[in-house]
From Swiss-Prot:
The lineage of its organism: Bacteria, Pseudomonadati, Thermodesulfobacteriota, Desulfovibrionia, Desulfovibrionales. Transmembrane segments: none annotated. It comes from the Bacteria. It comes from Desulfovibrio desulfuricans (strain ATCC 27774 / DSM 6949 / MB). This is Small ribosomal subunit protein uS7. Part of the 30S ribosomal subunit. Contacts proteins S9 and S11. One of its GO terms (biological process) is translation. Keywords: Ribonucleoprotein, Ribosomal protein, RNA-binding, rRNA-binding, tRNA-binding.
Length: 156
């Protein structure tokens, strides 16, 4: 922990096409070895494909896909008297966004399609329709929180 007070949040610049900070965060998370151009190319083509399939505006379709993956509750380990309890906690909005982005990208990478563009667009389309790996992860997280509701009084 820093002694000089809280560390300031770094400002993320909005992306050039849609002027969205959310897209910039997604692209930065998608990027490997500092190759932002390649990550942007993959993302924008996936977004166009998503808009084509859904018939909605690209940004709106992306936001809906992200909303379908955002977790509202999660469990955190808490030690009480030698026992570790999984305590359900609410997820902060900032963490909701970062978790949903992380899950979407991880499950897109583990898909069977050929090429990252196809993988990402398929995962985004599945998330838009309320299915797929990332949505399943969210459901599992909510199920865990629901199962451990008895330990919610250990919240800190």
């Amino acid at each position: 922990m820093p002694r000089k007070g809280p560390v300031p949040k770094r400002e993320v610049l909005p992306d050039p096409i849609y002027s969205s900070r959310l897209i910039t965060k997604f692209v930065n998370r998608l990027m490997y070895d500092g190759k932002k151009g390649a990550a942007e190319k993959i993302f924008y083509s996936s977004l166009e494909h998503l808009a084509e399939k859904t018939g909605e505006e690209p940004m709106r379709a992306f936001e809906k896909a992200l909303d379908n993956v955002k977790p509202h509750m999660e469990v955190k380990a808490r030690r009480v008297g030698g026992a570790t309890y999984q305590v359900p906690m609410e997820v902060r909005p900032e963490r909701q966004v970062s978790l949903s982005i992380r899950w979407l990208i991880n499950y897109a990478r583990s898909r069977g399609e050929k090429g990252m563009t196809a993988k990402l667009s398929a995962e985004l389309l599945d998330a838009f329709n309320g299915r797929g790996g990332a949505v399943k992860k969210r459901e599992d997280t909510h199920r865990m929180a629901d199962a451990n509701k008895a330990f919610s009084h250990y919240r800190w």
